[in-house]
């Protein structure tokens, strides 16, 4: 067995029982701070799970090439009208997290304020040329009117297409829009969105 010297200089010979060594220099290392994900919204204490739009949607396609409900990563999830306008969504369902963070997405549809006060848009995952079907990297997202009326909502969406964002919200399936073109022929949404920020990327 031998000895391994780190940042020392010297000479050792296999026939000698002793080694000469001298210090060769200081060893310097830089470590990034370990930061846990936290909610950016003061309204929810849920801890987000970092994911991507393609992970939320999965790879299973329906006849219109939209993402299927069964193929999504987050099973089970919020679903349908009874869970559509929650002011205080649960942080998990059956052990599956409901609250997620999606980073580096860009606005790909002009924001729209609907009759139920929801402020909605579509976002597309940046930097994924490997996914050729745009419906598998684009997601409908909504700031819920219940949150807006309750004064706990984030700011409304920026109007400029292509704006890069990081978004936190709750995974939701809306069965009313699985045949809708502007909804990517899929029910997947982030709804309600709890917070967003401009992406640093």
Please tell me what each predicted stretch does:
Residues 2-201:
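OB-fold and OB-like single-stranded nucleic-acid-recognition modules
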């Amino acid at each position: 067995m031998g000895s391994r010297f780190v940042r020392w200089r010297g000479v050792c010979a296999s026939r000698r029982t002793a080694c000469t060594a001298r210090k060769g220099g200081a060893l310097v290392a830089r470590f990034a701070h370990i930061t846990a994900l936290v909610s950016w919204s003061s309204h929810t204490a849920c801890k987000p799970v970092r994911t991507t739009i393609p992970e939320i949607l999965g790879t299973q396609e329906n006849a219109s090439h939209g993402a299927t409900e069964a193929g999504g990563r987050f099973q089970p999830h919020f679903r349908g009208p009874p869970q559509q306008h929650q002011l205080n969504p649960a942080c998990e369902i059956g052990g599956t997290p409901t609250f997620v963070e999606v980073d580096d997405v860009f606005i790909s549809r002009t924001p729209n304020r609907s009759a139920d006060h929801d402020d909605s848009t579509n976002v597309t995952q940046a930097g994924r040329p490997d996914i050729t079907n745009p419906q598998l990297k684009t997601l409908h997202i909504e700031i819920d009117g219940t949150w807006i009326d309750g004064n706990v909502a984030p700011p409304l969406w920026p109007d400029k297409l292509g704006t890069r964002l990081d978004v936190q919200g709750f995974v939701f399936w809306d069965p009313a829009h699985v045949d809708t073109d502007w909804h990517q022929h899929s029910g997947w949404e982030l709804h309600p969105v709890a917070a967003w920020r401009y992406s640093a990327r």
